[in-house]
């Protein structure tokens, strides 16, 4: 196996373990976990494919402990959508010659909490149509706000540490897509 592939799998394993542990051990805090922020940071450092793989591993393994159901697909979908939006933003910033800054990216991470809720709630649209979707989403809006605020705070905490630790590795591995 190519050494970069081994490094990629190892990094996904490490970050997934952090995400999984946080989902399990912080479950008493409603929607306040570092998972979305770590996924955003992973896309920034290692690219879209890495972020998608991290999202799938995090969701499937943590849901083996927390409960597996139809929502698992929509959780994966939500984090993949966040990966796509993050990659689009990174490509745009690169095109205009800008580097992502801490506070604006924390604000971006905040809004991704609402994106997550909108996408996860799509299950209700399929089950009960637009009326159920709207009611379900509105009922969960407080939890999406917890998610958003948690993302903002966790991004401010995690980004400086993870970027410092993994930036050199991402350049060495050349996982990031150009």
Where are the predicted features?
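Helix-boundary and loop/linker segments of multi-pass membrane transporters
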Residues: 1-5, 29-30, 94-99, 129-133
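Structural signal for the C-terminal ends of transmembrane alpha-helices
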Residues: 45-49, 85-94, 161-167
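Membrane-embedded alpha-helical hairpins and interfacial helices in multi-pass inner-membrane proteins
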Residues: 68-73, 98-178
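Short helix-perturbing small/polar motifs within transmembrane alpha-helices
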Residues: 8-16, 54, 74-125
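Hydrophobic transmembrane alpha-helices of multi-pass small-molecule transporters
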Residues: 37-40, 63, 83, 87, ...
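Transmembrane alpha-helix boundary and packing residues in multipass membrane permease domains
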Residues: 40, 59, 83-87, 121, ...
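Interfacial aromatic-anchored transmembrane helix boundaries in multi-pass membrane proteins
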Residues: 20-32, 56-90, 128
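Hydrophobic transmembrane alpha-helices
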Residues: 1-41, 45, 49, 53
């Amino acid at each position: 196996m190519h050494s970069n592939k081994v490094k990629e799998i190892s990094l996904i394993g490490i970050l997934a373990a952090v995400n999984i542990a946080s989902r399990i051990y912080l479950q008493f805090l409603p929607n306040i976990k570092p998972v979305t922020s770590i996924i955003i940071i992973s896309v920034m450092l290692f690219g879209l494919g890495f972020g998608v793989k991290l999202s799938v591993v995090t969701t499937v393994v943590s849901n083996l402990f927390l409960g597996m159901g139809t929502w698992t697909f929509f959780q994966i979908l939500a984090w993949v959508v966040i990966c796509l939006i993050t990659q689009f933003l990174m490509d745009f910033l690169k095109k205009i010659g800008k580097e992502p800054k801490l506070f604006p990216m924390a604000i971006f991470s905040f809004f991704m909490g609402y994106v997550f809720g909108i996408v996860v709630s799509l299950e209700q649209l399929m089950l009960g149509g637009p009326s159920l979707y709207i009611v379900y989403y509105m009922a969960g809006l407080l939890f999406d706000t917890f998610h958003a605020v948690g993302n903002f705070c966790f991004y401010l905490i995690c980004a400086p540490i993870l970027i410092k630790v993994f930036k050199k590795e991402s350049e060495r591995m050349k996982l990031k897509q150009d």
